[in-house]
């Protein structure tokens, strides 16, 4: 798989090349939300294009990360490390996080 930063750059450049938004961050979040909805609809209706819809979600997320100057690959790896260290358990019949998993805990 290509480097995350390169994918971010490509997603952003595609927006620029097509004259799409690269400055209105709230709009980008709304568009991302819409793509998540489309992916859910594809899944719930058992459509064969659910993978393509999930790719759209990823592309919007990569573009937004580039707009916000966030190294998404680094952040995903960091967050996955935190999630691995978290401990969960059932409290009153509901799964809950028992330990945060943050460094130093």
Regions found by a protein language model. Name each.
Residues 1-105:
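Flexible "arm" and connector segments at domain edges
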């Amino acid at each position: 798989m290509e480097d995350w930063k390169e994918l971010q750059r490509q997603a952003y450049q595609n927006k620029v090349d097509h004259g799409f938004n690269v400055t209105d961050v709230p709009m980008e979040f709304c568009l991302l939300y819409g793509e998540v909805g489309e992916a859910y609809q594809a899944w719930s209706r058992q459509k064969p294009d659910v993978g393509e819809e999930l790719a759209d979600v990823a592309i919007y997320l990569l573009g937004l990360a580039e707009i916000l100057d966030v190294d998404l690959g680094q952040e995903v790896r960091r967050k996955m490390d935190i999630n691995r260290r978290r401990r969960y358990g059932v409290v009153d019949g509901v799964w809950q996080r028992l330990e945060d998993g943050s460094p130093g805990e």
